[in-house]
Each structure stands twice: as structure tokens, then as C-alpha cells.
């Protein structure tokens, strides 16, 4: 909605400028004529009374002006008391009604101070009473409308009738008829009476025309009270008229909003408008909302895993119970090792394995044959031990069970029957050097088996090198190496290079 503040301000400034220009055109010639007449009359008085000089005439005019400012009648032999009780009552009414004619005003400091506090409490009280009086007349108008509707008059006609009666009654009683009364009592013409009526009812109160203060007039005893009551009724009518205008503007504004709402609803219900809104929505979707972009959650590793699981569930068909195309062996991925070849991870930092441990490890891998007793002993705990757990890839489980994978419930796979041996090195040989030395030792062992047999005699099986490779992984090719060749490789690696 457009802000109406600048528009109203511009309208007020324009209205003031137009009014000032019109008043200047209408009143300035009269002021110039009055000024010219004043100087002409002064010269005429000086010629008529030659003994009176210019200074004497100015002193007389100053005295007269000061007396008029104090509220004293400067013409005639009779004086008018503006501060007796009836006239003071009219002055008090002009204070609390905010009319303020200005023809009579307090002259003493005490009177001026009392006028301030009197108006401070009297103005709100008077405005409240005038508002209540206006509501009273509004209630009478409402009852008149109800009476008309009961007589069979339509609601709209009853409203129009009450409004017309209200406006005509106010205009007649407060603007049209009073000037005739003032023509008789005050000696004004009709324009002056109409002017005074409007200036008084609108609380402008210039004070150039005031009823009931002419000292040469012979007023009725109730005339001043009649004028005061007329002022109060006129202010109540004006208050009701302003409230009616405000309510009328409010109703008009509501009607305009209601019409706009209906027009908008009819526009949205039409197929052409829907199509236009869809086109507008498609074009607006291309705009980037920076706030939603900044508040977008960053994807983490868990989110990516969940997305992979959802994709696997979708590709598996959603309702199938069989394995889907995962990353495990069932989905065409990497094959899983059988339980017999699952490596055993043993980490020993400074401990040297004994000969019995080496023999047991080689026998378990099939490099050394076992005796029947040893096979029976080795087979006994295997039969009594529970079946080994079969671990499956989490993504394969997702595709089989068709359920999303919660990354928080994932636990790493721990193989309890592994055969990978990690031997810590203190000498610091790298994996590449170890692999090269192992290859050279294997070639040397095939060329000189006798040298390897001689080196087997002084072998102490209770000691293992602490400077071997840091990582050793057993594969299928190593499982076929005989026991003697392994011992030859071991002796070759531990023997000094010079021998």
C-alpha cells in the first residue's frame, strides 16, 4: 500500500498556498484602503482642531487603544463590565470549548495562571461531555431508523433518511437560522451572522464578532444563556458529524478492500490466472534464496553412506528379499576370503616367538604335517567351540534387508581368526628392502641348498629376529612354501653378509 503521508503533506501545503493567495487578493486591497482612510481622517482632525498638534493626537490615540485592549468601551458614555458573573460565564465557556474569541482575556498574573490550570482540566472534561451528547443524538437517529424499518422502509432508505435529517437539522439549527436572530439582537447583516455562527461552531473564534457583548445593545436576560446553549449543541453536532464522516470513510475503505479481495479470488479461480501463476512460480524458482543457501546443512560422510544405502535399496527392487547389487561378493564386488584363509592379526613389539609357536603356526597353515595325536587334540577344541561368526558387508546387508543403514550403529569388523603377523622392527628396515631381500634369499636358497642345510644346524629356534619387516601378509603363494625353505630363508636373513 502506498504511504499517504507525503501525499497528505503536499495536499495541506497546496491548500494553504491557495488559501493565502485568495485571502491576499480579497483582503489586501481593503487593508490598503483602510490605511489610506486612517491617514486622511487624522489630517482632517488636525485641520479641524488646529490647536491640537500631531503629538497630542498620537497621545489620544494611544490612550484609546490601551483602553480598548483592557476591555473598556471607548465609545459612548456607558461602560460594559466584561467580568460580571454572566459575562464571566461566557468567557469560561469560550475557554473550555477552545473557542477563545480573544475580545476578553485575563490581564492580571493570577488570572492568567488560573486560566492555564482551568483550561488544562476543563478542556478534556468538556470534550468528553460533548462526545457523550453527540452519542445521545446519534442514538435518537438510530431509533428513528429502527422506527422506519419497522414501518416497512428498507434499510438503505432508512439510513439515507436518517443521514439527511441529521445533516439538515444541524445546518438549519446551527448555521442558517441563527444569523436571523443575530440580525435582530446584534444589528449584523446575514453574512456577518453566518460568519460568526461558523467561526463559533468550528471553534476557530477570531473574536471580531462576539454575541452579547455590545454595550449599546439592550439584551434579554436569557439571551446570553441561549447563546451558550446554542454553542454546546453546535459542538455536539459537529462532533457527531465528524464521527459519522470517519465511520463513513472506514466503511468505504472496508468495501474497497472487500471488492479487491473478491476480484483477487475471482482472478485466482480463473484458468488463465492459474497458468500465469504457474509460469511466475517457474521463473521465481530460478532465483537463489541466499538465506536458505546459507542455512543448508553440509553433507557429511554418514549422509553419503545413507545415500548409497538408499540407492542400493531402490536398485534392489524394494520388495525383494534376495541380495541386491551391493559392493560385496553377492553383488559382484570383491570376493570374500573363506573362513580357513582369514588372517590372524598378531602384534608383538619386543617378544620373540618360540619354536613351538612357529611350528604350531606352520602346522595350522598346512606347511608341516601333523601326527594323528596332534590332529585329534587340535580337532577337539574346534568341535566344542562355537561356530565362527560370518561377517558381511554392511552395504550388502542393506540390499538384502532393504532397510536404510544408520551410520551411528556401524561397528568395524574385527576378525578373531586372522593370521597376519606384525613384527615390530627396531632396525627400521622398510617394506621395499625387506621384499627385495626375501626375493634374493629365495633365489639363493634354490641355487645352494647345501649351504642352507649347513646354516640350519646352528639355528636357535627360540629366537626370532627383531629387525624383520614391519608388515607381513600371508597369501596363497606362501602357503605352498615347504618348511625347510622357510628355515633356509630365515638363516640367510640372520647370517652376516660377509660369511
Curated annotation (Swiss-Prot):
Region (Disordered): 312-335, 360-388, 428-499
Activity-pH behavior: The homodimer is gated open at pH > 6. The heterodimer with KCNK16 or KCNK17 is gated open at physiological pH range 7-8 and increases current conductance at alkaline pH without apparent saturation.
A Pfam cross-reference name: Ion_trans_2
Compartments where located: Membrane
Consequence recorded when altering residue 203 to C: Abolishes voltage-dependent gating. Conducts instantaneous currents with linear current-voltage relationship
Positions annotated to bind K(+) 3: 100-101, 205-206
InterPro entries: 2pore_dom_K_chnl (IPR003280), 2pore_dom_K_chnl_TASK (IPR003092), K_chnl_dom (IPR013099)
Domain notes: The pore-forming domains 1 and 2 assemble to form a single pore in which M2 and M4 transmembrane helices line the central cavity and M1 and M3 face the lipid bilayer. The transmembrane helices are bridged by the selectivity filters 1 and 2 carrying a signature sequence TxTTxGYGD that coordinate the permeant ions. Up to four ions can simultaneously occupy the selectivity filter and at least two elementary charges must translocate across the filter to convert it into the open conformation.
Record-given protein name: Potassium channel subfamily K member 5
Species the sequence originates in: Homo sapiens
Gene: KCNK5
